[in-house]
């Protein structure tokens, strides 16, 4: 199909009882629960580490730099990790990477408790954590569908997005409370302990078998094969580019929340917990709506509404001096983030065959992981130079250009592509 197709929404089978019926599968229920707790701990630590870094440096540039250093190895490794996830046990990959991340969390806590923590130590451990993230993320996303029957895969994908938003809603709020009453060290230690639960769960679950690529094929050849598969199909190519744009212009706001809390609203750096909690609550309510609506929501509609909401959120942040309105802006950003994540995630997971899924998800995640450090570094550095309000105005304007290009070109329709259109092998 060489001409733009009027795409249709994928019709998915349901086992009855709605998306929550999927929790009858023991392994999915266990992994969902453990991951929710552990990811909540990660967000708790993010609140603590952001506040710690800003208290040590009082510079938005350092916040951006710590994000860049932690995500650059993830960006560089993710495509190769996608090849790995398509040819070896995703379960084993996750067991190893979760262990590494647990060790970095305990090391960070030890340095803080020993009163020898410095910005460079935070960056160094963030780099190690980023290496683990690079190998982990593709395996995680492509592992979740293996915990349920194939016909219930997209229900699992949607609820995996809900799991992350649950963590985002609860983690920052708990992090703020733990930091206030127990200190930064308590938040970091809590996160370290939660990894034990995930590692134990990964030992006992039994994923279904799936098609894997031949190990005889070289890593570079496998990577190029996956890249061609994604590039030759415009809906998949568009998903990666939109993930990059949403991360650069929208999601990066999470990583400069400490600076915005102090510079825009004159709160302490720990005020980032309130902003991030509002973001998480927005994402949580958005996910509940998404689960109830299921397949009735068109992916193209979700994406367009998401970008419009991001622009509204950033514009409100640039204009208001009220911390409460700042929380409203982050709430709107949370709604936007969830809708974009579900739209793009289900597009790829629902149309790409198993033998390509690890690599397909790696390129999608590459867009996310590349956009966050670019956005956070640029926003943080520009904020230090020209002020955060002007920086946010420029950010909203850039995202508006993306929305305009998507609408004028008509490419937004490609987001509703069906598995049959993707499997044809011709550009849509």
Pin down the residues of each PLM region.
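Alpha-helical transmembrane-bundle signature of multi-pass membrane transport and export proteins
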Residues: 1-428
């Amino acid at each position: 199909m060489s001409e733009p197709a009027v795409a249709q929404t994928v019709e998915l089978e349901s086992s009855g009882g709605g998306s929550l019926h999927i929790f009858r599968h023991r392994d999915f229920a266990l992994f969902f629960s453990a991951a929710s707790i552990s990811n909540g701990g990660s967000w708790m630590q993010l609140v603590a580490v952001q506040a710690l870094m800003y208290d040590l440096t009082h510079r938005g540039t350092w916040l951006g730099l710590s994000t860049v250093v932690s995500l650059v190895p993830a960006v560089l490794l993710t495509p190769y990790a996608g090849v790995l996830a398509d040819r070896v046990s995703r379960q084993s990959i996750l067991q190893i990477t979760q262990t590494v991340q647990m060790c970095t969390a305990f090391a960070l806590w030890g340095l803080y408790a020993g009163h020898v923590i410095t910005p460079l130590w935070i960056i160094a451990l963030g780099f190690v954590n980023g290496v683990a993230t690079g190998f982990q993320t593709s395996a995680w996303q492509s592992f979740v569908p293996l915990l349920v029957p194939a016909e219930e895969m997209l229900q699992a994908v949607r609820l995996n997005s809900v799991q992350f938003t649950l963590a985002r809603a609860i983690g920052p709020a708990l992090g703020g409370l733990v930091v206030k009453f127990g200190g930064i060290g308590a938040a970091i230690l809590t996160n370290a302990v939660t990894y034990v639960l995930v590692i134990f769960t990964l030992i006992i679950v039994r994923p279904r078998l799936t098609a894997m690529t031949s190990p005889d094929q070289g890593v570079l050849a496998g990577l190029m094969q996956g890249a061609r598969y994604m590039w030759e199909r415009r809906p998949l190519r568009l998903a990666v580019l939109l993930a990059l744009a949403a991360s650069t212009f929208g999601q990066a706001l999470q990583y400069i929340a400490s600076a915005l809390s102090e510079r825009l609203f004159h709160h302490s750096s720990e005020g980032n917990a309130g902003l991030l909690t509002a973001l998480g609550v927005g994402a949580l309510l958005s996910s509940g709506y998404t689960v109830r609506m299921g397949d009735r929501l068109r992916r193209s509609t979700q994406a367009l509404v998401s970008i419009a909401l991001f622009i509204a959120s950033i514009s409100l942040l640039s204009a208001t001096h009220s911390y409460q309105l700042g929380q409203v802006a982050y709430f709107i950003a949370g709604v936007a983030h969830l809708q974009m994540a579900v739209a793009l995630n289900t597009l790829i997971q629902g149309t790409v065959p198993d033998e390509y899924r690890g690599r397909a998800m790696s390129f999608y995640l590459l867009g996310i992981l590349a956009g966050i450090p670019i956005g956070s570094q640029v926003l943080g550095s520009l904020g230090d130079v020209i002020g955060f309000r002007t920086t946010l105005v420029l950010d909203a304007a850039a995202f508006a250009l993306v929305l305009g290009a998507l609408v004028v070109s008509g490419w937004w329709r490609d987001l509703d592509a069906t598995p049959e259109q993707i499997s044809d092998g011709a550009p849509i």
